[in-house]
């Protein structure tokens, strides 16, 4: 139906529209200083060295476009929800495959992208994950979940552009708020491949996360 086939190039949607309210800073956390430059530029510079990525779309407020001056990127405007921002970025995508990455995650590794893309070519969608190191309890009713059956989801995620578009449209029609991008494939009853991370994954949500990101370099 979707003609899942191999194509060597992907677009990258780099999400940079978040407000960063939980971080408590006076500016969105993706623009906080990290090794002498805004945090998001660390991810962008890593992405520019990844051969599978042929174009990058930054989803950000117009007031922050100047941060990306001199970089070969396109721009799209953020929406109210994550899925609205992703849909906005998709309007600029020129490739049949797309990677989606959070701007508050400073690391995007070439070997993991290669494995993600290879897996997505087989199924239509793939996400980076890691094992759950803790005991997890469901709240209502209270019970202990089997952590060996669970995974922590990270970005980037790779998905066929057509699948992501149709899944987002389905979510909007059914008033479903997506919590990650490969959930769009799940809504269409399509498989999602899980690719386990080879490197530590950091999402900068709180100040201590930024300290940890520095320590990983």
Curated annotation (Swiss-Prot):
It comes from the Bacteria. GO terms for biological process: isopentenyl diphosphate biosynthetic process, methylerythritol 4-phosphate pathway. GO terms for molecular function: 2-C-methyl-D-erythritol 4-phosphate cytidylyltransferase activity. CDD domains: CDP-ME_synthetase. InterPro entries: IspD, IspD/TarI, IspD/TarI_cytidylyltransf_bact, ISPD_synthase_CS, Nucleotide-diphossugar_trans. Keywords: Isoprene biosynthesis, Nucleotidyltransferase, Transferase. It holds the Pfam family IspD. Catalyzes the formation of 4-diphosphocytidyl-2-C-methyl-D-erythritol from CTP and 2-C-methyl-D-erythritol 4-phosphate (MEP). PANTHER family: 2-C-METHYL-D-ERYTHRITOL 4-PHOSPHATE CYTIDYLYLTRANSFERASE, CHLOROPLASTIC. This is 2-C-methyl-D-erythritol 4-phosphate cytidylyltransferase. It comes from Chlamydia abortus (strain DSM 27085 / S26/3).
């Amino acid at each position: 139906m979707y003609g899942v086939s191999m194509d060597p190039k992907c677009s990258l949607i780099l999400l940079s529209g978040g407000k960063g309210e939980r971080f408590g800073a006076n500016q969105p956390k993706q623009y906080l200083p990290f090794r002498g430059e805004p945090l998001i530029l660390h991810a962008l510079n890593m992405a520019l060295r990844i051969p599978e990525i042929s174009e990058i779309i930054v989803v950000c407020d117009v007031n922050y476009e100047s941060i990306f001056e001199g970089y070969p990127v396109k721009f799209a405007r953020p929406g109210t929800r994550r899925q609205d921002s992703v849909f906005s970025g998709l309007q600029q995508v020129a490739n049949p495959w797309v990677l989606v990455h959070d701007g508050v995650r400073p690391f995007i590794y070439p070997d993991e992208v290669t494995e993600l893309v290879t897996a997505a070519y087989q199924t239509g969608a793939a996400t980076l994950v890691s094992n759950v190191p803790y005991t997890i309890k469901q709240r209502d009713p209270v019970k202990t979940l089997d952590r060996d059956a669970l995974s922590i989801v990270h970005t980037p995620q790779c998905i066929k552009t057509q699948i992501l578009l149709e899944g987002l449209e389905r979510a909007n029609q059914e008033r479903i708020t997506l919590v990650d991008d490969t959930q769009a494939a799940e809504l269409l009853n399509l498989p999602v491949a899980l690719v386990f991370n080879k490197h530590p994954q950091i999402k900068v949500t709180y100040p201590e996360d930024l300290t940890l990101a520095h320590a990983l370099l």
